[in-house]
Swiss-Prot record:
Key words, A-Z: Cytoplasm, Ribosome biogenesis
Gene3D superfamilies: 3.30.300.20
Domain of life according to the entry: Bacteria
Main location: cytoplasm
Subcellular location(s) of the protein: Cytoplasm
Assembly description: Monomer. Binds 30S ribosomal subunits, but not 50S ribosomal subunits or 70S ribosomes.
Annotated protein name in UniProt: Ribosome-binding factor A
Record InterPro entries: KH_dom-like_a/b, RbfA, RbfA_dom_sf, Ribosome-bd_factorA_CS
Function: One of several proteins that assist in the late maturation steps of the functional core of the 30S ribosomal subunit. Associates with free 30S ribosomal subunits (but not with 30S subunits that are part of 70S ribosomes or polysomes). Required for efficient processing of 16S rRNA. May interact with the 5'-terminal helix region of 16S rRNA.
Organism (species): Legionella pneumophila (strain Lens)
Keyword Cell membrane on entry: no
Length: 123
């Protein structure tokens, strides 16, 4: 069972690398102007489905999610041409909110405990 997890992790890594190259080259939707970053990929143990977590700069996340999920079957076939797997998992794109969450926490911490440059000068 331990080998199964290692294999799914390797496949997830490979899918992440390949999709990072395929998406900017293959998706020609004019609504997709922002830079899409694949932050994580989680592959099911049976390799039937893959959740693709992404972030995007300067774009509406719901629009980009719809674009990517609409192009999922095309991206799956493009992925199948570039990797050697018996079956390529179905792709499900999910916006990764962890980056925004981290930035929000950082802002809250800075509000509560603002960095004080004058105390550094006095020491």
């Amino acid at each position: 069972m331990n080998n199964n997890f290692k294999r799914t992790d390797r496949i997830a890594e490979m899918i992440q690398r390949k999709l990072a190259l395929i998406i900017p080259q293959e998706i020609k939707d004019p609504r997709l102007k922002g830079f899409v970053t694949i932050s994580a990929v989680k592959v099911a143990a049976d390799l039937g489905h893959a959740k693709i977590y992404f972030t995007v700069l300067n774009e509406d996340k719901s629009v980009v999610t719809n674009i990517l999920n609409g192009a999922a079957s095309y991206l799956r076939s493009a992925l199948a041409r570039s990797i050697t797997l018996r079956t390529v998992p179905q792709l499900h794109f999910i916006y990764d909110e962890s980056i925004e969450y981290g930035q929000r926490l950082s802002r809250l911490i800075d509000e509560v405990n603002p960095p004080d440059s004058s105390s550094d000068d006095n020491n």
